[in-house]
C-alpha cells in the first residue's frame, strides 16, 4: 500500500519570510561518486555561510533556504527532508538525530536520538535459551526499530531558532519526491550489497527492476507515497509520525514482522520527548602559537566530542603539541604520537 511504502522507508533507516510552494527551483547537480581508494579533496573556506550534506541535492536545498533568508536550523531541516528521500540507506525521519546549535554566543545541544519502546527489556536481543541473537538476525527485525526522534528534535529546534515557516522547509523534498531524482552511485552500491531488502515486496518494487536487480545509476526514482507523508509533515509537524495513518502504518510494520516482531506502540510514538543537554566543551591551546580555542560538541550518548577531547588531551601531554607544521602538515614524528 501507499502508506506501507512510506513505513518501509521510515522503519529502514537534527516566521519572517513566506515563500510560495514553487519558489524552490531544484537543479540536479552531480551525484556523489563511489568512494574507492584515496581521493584528494580541496579545502574550502567561507565568510558568510556553508552547507555540507551527504548528497548534493540535499546541499542544494539547504543553500536555497539560506538564500531565502532562512536560519541554519531552517537549512538543516530542508537538508534532512531531502536526505530522507535520496539517502534512505543512511539517513531519514524514521530514525534519530543530534542537533548542535551555535548562534555566536551560546551553544545548545538537542538530543533527538531514537529510544527503545517502553516494553523493551534487557532480554530484547536474547533467544529462547537466553543466548544473544546473531547480529543481523536482530538488526533485520522489528526488535531493532527504535521510537523515532528526528522530526521532534528538528521541530523543537525550529520553534526556537527558525525564521521561515516550517511547511516551506519541506517543499524541496516534496518536489523531488514527486518529480523524481536520479539514483546515485552510492545508493546503487548500497543496494548491490544488500541481500535482504529484496524480500520486502513493497521495497522491492521501488528499488529493484523486474529481474530483481537494483535500478541502475541515473535511474529516476519517484516516490509519491513519501511525498504524501511529507505533505502531512508540512501540515502537522512531528504529529505526522505520532498520530494518524502514517504512525499506525509504522507501528504495524514493526509489530507484524514475520519472525521477530517489535513491541513499539502508538503510545511510544506519542510520548517521545526531546532532551535539551549541556554541550560538552573543553579548552584547547595550540602550543606552537599560544592561540586558544573552546571546542564544543555533543555530550553522551554521542561519543564524537568526547573522543576528540580525549585525543587532544593526550596529545597535549606529549611533545606533539610543540612540533611545528612542515608546509602546513604534520611530520612523521607528530603522526607517531597521534597514532
Q: Which role does the model predict for each range below?
A:
Residues 22-60, 64, 72-236, 241-243, ...:
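Noncatalytic scaffold domains of N-terminal-nucleophile
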Residues 1-5:
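Bacterial N-terminal signal peptides that target proteins for export
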Amino acid at each position: 500500500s501507499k502508506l506501507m511504502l512510506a513505513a518501509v522507508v521510515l522503519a529502514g533507516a537534527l516566521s519572517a519570510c513566506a515563500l510560495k510552494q514553487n519558489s524552490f527551483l531544484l537543479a540536479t547537480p552531480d551525484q556523489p561518486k563511489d568512494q574507492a581508494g584515496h581521493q584528494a579533496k580541496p579545502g574550502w573556506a567561507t565568510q558568510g555561510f556553508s552547507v555540507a550534506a551527504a548528497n548534493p541535492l540535499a546541499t542544494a536545498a539547504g543553500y536555497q533556504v539560506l538564500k531565502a533568508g532562512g536560519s541554519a536550523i531552517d537549512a538543516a531541516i530542508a537538508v534532512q527532508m531531502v536526505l530522507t528521500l535520496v539517502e534512505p540507506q543512511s539517513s531519514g525521519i524514521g530514525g534519530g538525530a543530534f542537533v548542535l546549535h551555535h548562534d555566536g554566543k551560546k551553544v545548545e545541544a538537542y538530543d533527538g536520538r531514537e529510544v527503545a519502546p517502553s516494553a523493551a527489556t534487557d532480554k530484547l536481543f536474547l533467544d529462547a535459551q537466553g543466548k544473544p541473537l546473531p547480529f543481523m538476525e536482530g538488526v533485520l527485525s522489528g526488535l531493532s526499530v527504535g521510537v523515532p526522534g528526528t522530526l521532534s528534535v528538528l521541530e523543537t529546534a525550529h520553534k526556537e531558532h527558525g525564521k521561515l515557516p516550517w511547511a516551506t522547509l519541506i517543499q524541496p523534498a516534496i518536489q523531488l519526491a514527486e518529480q523524481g531524482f536520479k539514483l546515485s552511485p552510492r545508493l546503487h552500491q548500497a543496494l548491490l550489497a544488500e541481500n535482504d531488502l529484496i524480500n520486502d515486496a513493497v521495497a522491492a518494487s521501488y528499488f529493484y527492476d523486474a529481474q530483481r536487480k537494483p535500478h541502475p545509476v541515473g535511474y529516476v526514482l519517484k516516490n509519491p507515497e513519501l511525498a504524501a507523508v511529507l505533505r502531512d509533515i508540512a501540515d502537522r509537524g512531528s504529529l505526522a509520525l505520532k498520530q494518524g495513518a502514517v504512525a499506525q502504518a509504522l507501528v504495524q510494520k514493526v509489530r507484524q514482522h514475520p519472525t521477530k516482531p517489535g513491541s513499539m506502540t502508538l503510545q511510544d510514538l506519542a510520548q517521545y520527548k526531546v532532551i535539551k543537554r549541556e554541550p560538552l566543551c573543553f579548552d584547547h591551546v595550540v602550543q606552537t602559537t599560544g592561540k586558544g580555542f573552546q571546542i564544543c560538541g555533543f555530550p553522551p550518548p554521542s561519543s564524537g566530542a568526547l573522543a576528540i577531547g580525549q585525543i587532544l588531551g593526550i596529545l597535549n601531554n606529549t611533545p606533539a603539541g610543540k612540533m611545528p607544521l612542515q608546509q602546513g602538515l604534520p611530520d612523521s614524528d607528530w603522526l607517531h604520537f597521534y597514532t
